């Protein structure tokens, strides 16, 4: 029995030893941390150096210090972790002045001792009932509950912190501090990303009392979704549009192509109908600018061709701009000044008409600028273009009348009718009508005719005046004037040879003293009808140039003799006429050398030629009018036969134009209806030729005088052959022509000798003859005329002084 008591005492001793050994080994790491919720509970927490069972080994004793008789309160801690002990102490309605004394015991050993004030260490309670409201249209509303009563100090002293973060990425969050009293937070929906899950939580803290943030409230989660604004949807819309528009265009292209191939191409179109005809003329372009079809097709883009096929009804044909030729400046077209110039352009269109309508012509013209040429090529091109501007080569351009020309012709006809009625009514009004100018073969010069009544017998004479070609309009066309008026053509006289002279009219009798000269009567009539106006550009001409030599005086005498041959008696012979002309010229101007009555060795062969002329005149008197002196061009022996060949001794210069349908007399035309035109150049008065019935017959007296003229005239220089003897060395100097040896005086006669040599005038024109003004043509232009039987020679306008009658034809 004693043995049992010994075993019990040994066991109790070991237990006490273990307890003492164990209690001495617990150690607190630092001071405990205490904080209060300032409503009912204060919490203390401390850390130990080793794992300890807090509830069995440790004990916390605390008591209120301000009351002397306050009781000690004990708190049993618990383990929050293996080395962390937490103890929750109950406090009844704490105030700011409360202070507690605290002691930590490990069995019978004190581990820590200190004090704690609840108002200095406040940790508010975590909010609860966190809610998100979505009933607001554009904002989120987040609410929570305040756990402090209204009588508590922390009810109005708490601030809140709201944390909103993505559920999938908590590091991306947004924090809102709520400083107002109400436990709520409102934020816009679009501040968060749409289509994302978000979580929210809240914690509070006292603003007045010292303390820390409360624990986080339980979190809530929601799905954020809203309609994006337009500015945020614009990039997406632009991207989608950039992708959809090309796809749509491609779809439309292939769809329209498919539909056109299946449906549109199967519909009959007027373009394939036989009722349509298109005649395209070749483009009038230079050869170097013409392009082949392959070159033109390469310049037309392929996409335009496809567009033409897709939308044929919406496309219009192209019209090219007007272009001018580079040679338009030196070569001007012959057109009316009152009308705009004809400019070709490309006109390409389709014409529809019924089957019974004639085919229309669509003219397609294209102009290309010629490349730059040198000076010689430009001169050759100008010559070619001048030749191509003739009526035959103009290609339908033609000469057109302008309104001004038509009015001028009507005015002339009106004045002619009035003058005829005033002078006793000279038969028919056709005598006053002016014949249209007959264009020459080259289109560069024209001959104008005028009707000139000749006294009571109503005979008419013809005068031809040169009308050089110019860019202005012509007075008419041959097709209009030839059938209506009968124009008798006087033998043409070429005005290019200064040695072409006549002296037969020097023997004509002088007019009576009381009677005016025929040229003065004509001048009076012309002044009454149409006084020249200095402002009129048609009536005014270039200033008169004085006659340069006595040979021109002789030439005008020939013209006067041809005009007065029908009314004056025939002279005895050509040599006597020449002597009288020379005497008269020497008497009026004795200072002119080379003009002597007789004895000039240059005319010794003249009398022998006159003898043959007299014999021929006797033999030919049966068929012709004898006694007409002066040299005239050759005429056909038979009027209705073709003209004979040109004699060799005339050098092709002194023959008349062969009759043609344009200038021949129509059948059954009375001589009094001959259409003539009086040509006035530079204000000079021109005498009319003799009447048609007094004109000498062909080959009456012309052959002999032609031989005389050919013998006396040098065909190289155009002057009379004068070979002076040795005794003439003391007279005025004589100039020898280069290349032929003919001598001629280099001094020109004075104006007095010129007018004196022309005093004798024919009496064939009666004083009462009425004159009408010819259509006015510009006198500053010259042309080049060609006629059958004549070689082309440059035309020269002969300047005729006042009182002289001249016929100048180019």
Curated annotation (Swiss-Prot):
Tissue: Expressed in both Th1 and Th2 cells.
Modified residues (Phosphotyrosine): 500, 575, 603, 631
GO aspect biological process, one term: defense response to protozoan
Subcellular localization, as worded in the UniProt entry: Cell membrane
Chief localisation class: membrane
Motif (WSXWS motif): 213-217
Gene3D superfamilies: Immunoglobulins (2.60.40.10)
Required for IL4-induced gene expression: region residues: 557-653
Residue positions of motif ITIM motif: 707-712
Post-translational modification: On IL4 binding, phosphorylated on C-terminal tyrosine residues.
Membrane topology recorded in Swiss-Prot or TrEMBL: Single-pass type I membrane protein
Superkingdom of origin: Eukaryota
GO CC field: centriolar satellite; extracellular region; nucleoplasm; plasma membrane; receptor complex
Extra information: The sequences from strains C3H, CBA, DBA/2 and FVB/N are all identical to the one displayed.
Domains (record comment): The extracellular domain represents the IL4 binding protein (IL4BP). The WSXWS motif appears to be necessary for proper protein folding and thereby efficient intracellular transport and cell-surface receptor binding.
Record-given protein name: Interleukin-4 receptor subunit alpha
Gene source species: Mus musculus (Mouse)
Lineage, opening ranks: Eukaryota, Metazoa, Chordata, Craniata, Vertebrata
Gene that encodes it: Il4r
